[in-house]
Amino acid sequence: MSDYNRSPIVNPIPTSILLIFFGIILVEAFLIFGFGGPLGKTETTIERLTLVQNYGVPPNLATWMFETGNFSIDYVSRFIVYPFINLSGLSVVFAAVLLLALGKMVGEFFSSFSVILIWLLSTLFAAFFYSISATDEQILVGSFPGIYGFVGAYTF
């Protein structure tokens, strides 16, 4: 008998990474299959822009919230929801690949709770500092701030 251990066909990915991954993919699937298919009809583009406008983090949002004292769920939720909305399908593909690759590496060294915490804190800090320091009128959306947090965690 041999002690040969077969490696799995697909490397196991931590559950916490899969939860984040499916959150990103579900939003994109809603946009693609709910509004006319993968070729990017006008309805898909309009709905994507509506999501960006309603759930992205605009510049000076945090400053405005502190000045007015308005911490309603509509504004606070933007800091948590924005990483699940991407500007294009290609952005989703790159974000998904980087998330799975870096998330697997980080998930091997940290617990699932720590991985979720790294993702959440990276996106929250990125949104907060963007909203108090941005000078242009671009709205912050996309999964990359959380992925950059995984880069930092992996190099740690």
List where the protein language model places each region.
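Alpha-helical transmembrane segments and their helix-start/interface "positive-inside/aromatic belt" motifs
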Residues: 7-23
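Hydrophobic alpha-helical transmembrane segments
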Residues: 17-22, 93, 116-120
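Residue-level recognition of pore/gate-forming positions within transmembrane alpha-helices
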Residues: 25, 122-123
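N-terminal TM1-TM2 helical hairpin plus the immediately adjacent luminal interfacial "cap"
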Residues: 28-116, 133-140
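Active-site His/Glu-centered metal-binding helix of metallohydrolases
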Residues: 93, 97, 128, 147
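Alpha-helical transmembrane segments of multipass membrane proteins
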Residues: 105, 124-132, 154
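Cytoplasmic-side transmembrane-helix entry/capping segments in multi-pass membrane proteins
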Residues: 113-121, 142-147
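Membrane-interface micro-motifs in multi-pass membrane enzymes
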Residues: 138-156
